């Protein structure tokens, strides 16, 4: 088969090979190559979405200029320079995040032991971290989790910011990670700043500190550098795969901002320029007729400081005031706003848009674009969570708590947070169950009024048992009445009382 990459290895691939070869077993990796990887890494594209989320748009770079007599363009610091950033990107990201994971992800399983472990792990902190992850991956295109076993031997996890990560995959499918490098700045208690780096392989973690411009093994870890993923009975154990979990925003790993940044910039520009015009055109332009008195500078000074002017003979003064194209600007902003919602695949849930048509078909149409975006993101989140629970299951197996297969035994349910007609949803779920096309478990998991499906199912079962018991008592009572008609009334009363006590 012909080589589909005839140009050979890239420089980065060559660096990767050197690092991997030097990191076999517990040999110390080549820190020179690590430094080169860090030098070649550019996190700026990841941070552009973060800037716009924080309303630090490119409009802040706006400058007003003029041309001098020589035709040279210069910055005019005397003119009004409005630089208004609009939080469109934040609106779209927050809407997507709350739509996807505003309601906690619910888990169900026939394996009650596994479900108990999972629900204990998926607490309020889990929900909060997942919300932050969806927000971050929408801003940056990708975000990472790091699962680990803490010093007390407990399973834990933390977000690794994507801008700190250099992740190298085994091949172009980008499924299996070869190794991951994290680098960041650390401030000590005295404010001193230190450069740190961590190299993650499928067996160990190597810790580095930059000293005199060179990354060296971080000796603050003592003999525990490199450190295994976990230990059992004094024996080092590795996960068998690199403990870095990518949460991709999409397959291209790009920010949502990419698809509508130009529209936001245009919106900011028109708004800021219009505000500049309001400030500039408050000044009146004076037309001097037959004016032969003072020079223009003297005229302006007299007018500004003394509110008087001098004219000669038939001279006079007229004024001009420029008209601001407010209507044209407003129409263009309205057009851009409409394009923004389409390009961002977002929902304009203003009263003017929704009106009084909050019924099933109208809401489905309103959320159609957001559903497209959310479906793609949900697939990527599921992939990240499946890998996360694989690590958790490995931890449970290594600690003797059970051998589980979350891929087959665990079901995740995402509840979309939207304006909805709850009565219509519940009615539809009831019809699905009674019609035999939906299980009771699925219906309960999708019920908008249910927070914990397992707890709700337990309550339903308890109520059904109580109802069955009541029905049994009623049947017993009816049987006692029949006996009363045939037997002695006193004996019947005694039997009825006895049955009541037994029940």
UniProtKB/Swiss-Prot annotation:
Major site of localization recorded for this protein: virion
InterPro entries: Portal_protein_SPP1_Gp6-like (IPR021145), Portal_SPP1-type (IPR006428)
Keyword terms: Capsid protein, Viral capsid assembly, Viral genome ejection through host cell envelope, Viral genome packaging, Viral long flexible tail ejection system, Viral penetration into host cytoplasm, Viral release from host cell, Virion, Virus entry into host cell
Signal peptide residues on this chain, from the entry's feature table: none
Alphabetical GO biological process terms: symbiont genome ejection through host cell envelope, long flexible tail mechanism; viral DNA genome packaging, headful
Record-level GO cellular component terms: viral portal complex; viral procapsid
Ranges of biased composition (kind: Acidic residues): 475-489
Cited Pfam families: SPP1_portal
Disordered: annotated span: 463-503
Localization in the cell: Virion
Function recorded in the entry: Forms the portal vertex of the capsid. This portal plays critical roles in head assembly, genome packaging, neck/tail attachment, and genome ejection. The portal protein multimerizes as a single ring-shaped homododecamer arranged around a central channel. Binds to the terminase subunits to form the packaging machine. Necessary to ensure correct procapsid size during capsid assembly. Once the capsid is packaged with the DNA, the terminase complex is substituted by the connector proteins gp15.
Oligomeric and partner information: Homododecamer. Has been seen as 13-mer and 14-mer multimer in experiments, but assembles as homododecamer in vivo. Interacts with the gp7 protein. Interacts with the connector proteins gp15; this interaction occurs at the end of the packaging when the terminase complex is replaced by the connector.
UniProt record similarity statement: Belongs to the SPP1-like portal protein family.
NCBIfam families on file: portal_SPP1
The protein's name in its UniProt record: Portal protein
Organism for this UniProt entry: Bacillus phage SPP1
Lineage, broadest ranks: Viruses, Duplodnaviria, Heunggongvirae, Uroviricota, Caudoviricetes
The gene coding this protein: 6
């Amino acid at each position: 088969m012909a080589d589909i990459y005839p140009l050979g290895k890239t420089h980065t691939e060559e660096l990767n090979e050197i690092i991997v070869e030097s990191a076999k077993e517990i040999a110390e990796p080549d820190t020179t190559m690590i430094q080169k990887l860090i030098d070649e890494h550019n996190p700026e594209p990841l941070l552009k979405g973060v800037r716009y989320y924080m309303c630090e748009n490119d409009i802040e770079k706006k400058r007003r200029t003029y041309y001098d007599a020589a035709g040279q363009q210069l910055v005019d610091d005397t003119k009004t320079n409005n630089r208004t950033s609009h939080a469109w990107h934040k609106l779209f990201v927050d809407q997507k995040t709350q739509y996807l994971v505003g309601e906690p992800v619910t888990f169900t399983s026939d394996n009650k032991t596994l479900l108990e472990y999972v629900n204990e792990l998926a607490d309020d902190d889990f929900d909060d971290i997942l919300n932050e992850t969806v927000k971050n991956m929408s801003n940056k295109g990708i975000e990472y989790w790091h699962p680990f076993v803490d010093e007390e031997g407990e399973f834990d996890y933390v977000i690794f910011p994507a801008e700190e990560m250099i992740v190298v995959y085994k091949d172009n499918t980008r499924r299996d990670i070869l190794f991951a490098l994290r680098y960041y700045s650390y401030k000590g208690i005295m404010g001193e700043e230190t450069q740190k780096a961590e190299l993650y392989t499928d067996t160990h973690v190597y810790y580095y500190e930059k000293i005199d411009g060179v990354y060296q093994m971080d000796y603050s870890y003592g003999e525990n550098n490199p450190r295994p993923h976990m230990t059992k009975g004094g024996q080092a154990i590795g996960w068998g795969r690199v403990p870095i979990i990518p949460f991709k925003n999409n397959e291209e790993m790009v920010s949502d901002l990419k698809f509508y940044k130009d529209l936001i910039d245009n919106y900011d520009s028109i708004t800021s320029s219009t505000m500049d015009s309001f400030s500039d055109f408050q000044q009146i332009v004076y037309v001097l007729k037959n004016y032969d008195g003072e020079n223009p500078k003297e005229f302006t000074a007299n007018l500004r400081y003394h509110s008087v002017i001098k004219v000669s003979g038939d001279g006079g003064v007229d004024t001009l005031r420029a008209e601001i194209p407010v209507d044209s600007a407003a129409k263009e902003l309205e057009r851009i706003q409409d394009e923004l919602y389409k390009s961002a695949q977002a929902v304009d849930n203003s009263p003017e848009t929704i009106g009084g048509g909050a019924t099933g078909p109208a809401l489905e149409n309103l959320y159609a674009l957001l559903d497209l975006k959310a479906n793609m993101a949900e697939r990527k989140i599921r992939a990240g969570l499946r890998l996360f629970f694989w690590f958790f299951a490995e931890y449970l197996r290594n600690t003797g708590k059970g051998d589980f297969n979350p891929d087959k035994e665990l079901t995740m349910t995402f509840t979309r947070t939207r304006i909805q007609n709850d009565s219509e949803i519940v009615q539809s779920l009831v019809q699905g169950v009674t019609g035999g096309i939906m299980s009771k478990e699925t219906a309960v998991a999708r019920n908008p009024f249910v927070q914990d499906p397992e707890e709700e199912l337990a309550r339903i079962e308890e109520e059904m048992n109580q109802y069955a018991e009541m029905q049994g008592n009623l049947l017993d009572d009816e049987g006692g009445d029949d006996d009363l008609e045939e037997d002695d009334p006193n004996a019947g009363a005694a039997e009825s009382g006895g049955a009541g006590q037994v029940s």
